[in-house]
Amino acid sequence: MFFRQIFDVRAAEPLNIFSSGGRKYKSVLKILSIIAMAAMLGIQIYVLLTHKVVLASDSQRYFELATNAVKNGVWYPSSLNIHDTYIFGNGLINLLILSIRLTGSIEAIKFVNIFCIYAILISCIYIIRKIFGDTEIQYWFTVIFCSTGTFWGEVAQARTELIFMAFAFGATALLMTGKIYTCLISGIFFALANWTRPLGVVFLIAGIWLLVTQRAKLKQYLCLVLGAAVTVCVIGGIAYFNCGYFAYQATTGGYNLLMGASEGADGTSKFEVFGEGGAGYLSEKQKSEMTFKEKDAFYKSEAMKWIKENPGDYIKLMPKKMLVTLYSEGYSLGTFYNDATAGNGGAFYRGLIGRMTGQSEEKLSSADIIVIWTQAVYMVTLVLAFVCVVFLIVKRRAAKLMPFIFTVAGAIGVTMLLVGGPRYHFPILPYIIMAAAILIQSVATIKEHKNEA
């Protein structure tokens, strides 16, 4: 009976306990959420006007690939990319190509990022309202979301996460309308999300689960699958025409797997394995002759070989990969240092602690304050989210939320199989915030009911 109440919506306890009914309390929260949104928008406009797009690592490579494509009059991927190490960020790179062709730079991505942030926010509020009704949870969610500095700094980043999230959360919200045609659009959005970042399949599976909880009609399932399948075929077909391969999505799986499953792996992104003497080493001749597909297969083969020989070591790395993925929220805050590499990593945090404790001659900067604030908000949110999941399961009220819990677990599970990194939890951050908002409201409701008694 316990497990049925967790997974079967009809057997689960109702979710109507989360509305306090207090008009004054609700009005205050509504005002706070409006203030939080206005403050976030103000900061974002400031970033938009005063900061250029910061590039490093993946974003630098996206820019280079887009620039090269524009010079050669092609889209991505093309025949120019057949011998690349991997194909990745397909959707974003093509957007950057469009931006360069229309405006001469990639600065327009900042407007796209702001649009995506509010698309994510609106989608999540809609999801909350469909599950819990017109409760205060939506306002708590808005306050926490807008108070998280990640959504300020990411405005000036050229990365895949925001576009992916806008499509993925938009697709999920559309599924909850209960209409057949929106399921078709949802399928298209899931496919576009996966085109941008290969995590869309986790959200798609959760979407199908969501339809199950809603007791959807067969037509809704068919429209969802049809929308996704047609979009995949169209994008893959265009890529095949351009480069001779059905390159619909990123092929970074083998590369990332080898980083997390090789001699010397520590759960983080370490590139020594690709150097001379490493399991992933390829000579210049091999690199120039092998296609991205062949390289991906080679990396996967080497990783699987190591896993078979060292299963215990591979499993031992999984908790660290999860920790590395969840511990930091500074990956977007390099914007405020005008350095995409700042705001993250052990060396940065050691320096920050030194400035905080006075052990360093350097004083805290405004960017440091933003990092400290964002990290504090995130850590509290993460703890509240974990407690919320336990609370919902123990109280047998998790059934309607299991698709979202699955999404979070699935995204973290992927990093545990491959390689960890703080950025990798960004796509599920709104669900973490949502869980924290649910717990805060449940505590407020319980407290109010006790006062009434």
Task: Locate the predicted segments by residue.
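Membrane-interface anchor segments at the N-terminal boundary of transmembrane helices
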Residues: 108, 317-404
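Membrane-interface alpha helices of multi-pass inner-membrane proteins
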Residues: 97, 142, 146, 174, ...
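Multi-pass, polyprenyl lipid-linked donor-dependent membrane glycosyltransferases
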Residues: 57, 87, 109-116, 140-170, ...
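Membrane-proximal stem/loop segments at transmembrane-domain junctions that anchor or position
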Residues: 248-348
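Extracytosolic helix-loop segments that constitute the early lumenal/periplasmic catalytic or substrate-binding loops
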Residues: 60-84, 91-92, 264-281
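Loop-to-helix entry region of an early transmembrane alpha helix in multi-pass inner-membrane enzymes
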Residues: 86, 90-98, 102-122, 154, ...
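Membrane-interface transmembrane helices that cradle and orient dolichyl/undecaprenyl
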Residues: 130-132, 169-185, 211-215, 440-443
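Transmembrane-helix signature of polytopic, membrane-embedded enzymes
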Residues: 108, 121-149, 165-166, 181, ...
